[in-house]
Amino acid sequence: MRIMKMKWLFFLLAVLYGHLPFAHALEPYSGSRIFWDTASRRTVFSSVGYARIIELQDGRLMAVCESGGIKIAFSQDKGSTWGSATKIVSNPAGIRECVPDLIQLSDGTIIVAYNPRPTSPYSEERKFGIRCKRSTDGGRTWSDEIFVNDALHTFADGCWEPSMLELPSGELQLYFADEGPYTSNNDQQISLCRSMDGGQTWSQAQKICYRQGSRDGMPVPVLLKDESQIVVIIEDNGWGYGDFFPTTVRTSLQNNWHNNYWVNATDPNREKTLNFNFCPTATGCRALAHADHVQERGSSARDARRIQPDH
């Protein structure tokens, strides 16, 4: 009798499985892929967070991270070996310097931008902000700290995650997630500050995208290869999936976010980036995407990018 019950159980499971959407064969993905050589892994920094890397004009690699301030390191051999880390920004009392970004301008100037984050208990003189430092000698020496933007002094009304882009005109742009304008709710926009003198002085922040009731965040800008458009990839939790979704917002280089233009919720220049045709819902794609984001948030907490929910 027990054997018969087991046979019926396997039969029912087989029938059920055969009717599930994910049981059907999917056409193999034929697009491009990237394979990483895990044997090439090298340690650049130890016990740090939010590392970024670029190739400099002289062929060196330069990395930056947060670790009790902001640290940098260089490689002379395309990343096979790395020099000792150098701290270029120290944490002031009651403030953590976080989430650095770096860029080398066409004239060779290197700029590192970062995000001062006050620790609790909060006080009005310690604000969440964006700052930067410049080097005109290949990273050997660095300028004094340069002011870019301030939000408020509380975690709920801060600013976050700077990312930079240089335009062909020489204009330097710094994008960041910005809660400062929304003190009465939990909304967040992407803001932009501009520099016309290589990062020495900066304009006031302007809005470039915002979805009411949602939290546009984590901007990374690029100029398309044909130099026709500025595209900024963000995370957007307003698509109705119950979590953040990779999204692009864009403008033409000619417009360049001028004439009070910004991308709202219904603007055709706001686009989702994932194509579920390659990973149908039935295969668990959305669940996996959600899980990956949750895992990223856990990693963020572990590496001290932020000890509170993602922005």
Spans of features found by a protein language model:
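C-terminal segment of classical bacterial N-terminal signal peptides
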Residues: L16-A23
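Extracytoplasmic beta-rich repeat domains
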Residues: C98-V99, D157-L165, G217-M218, T281
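Beta-rich carbohydrate-recognition and catalytic domains
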Residues: L26-I95, Q104-F155, E166-G213, L223-F278, ...
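N-terminal secretory signal peptides that target proteins for export/translocation
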Residues: M1-M6
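Sec-dependent N-terminal signal peptides
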Residues: W8-L16
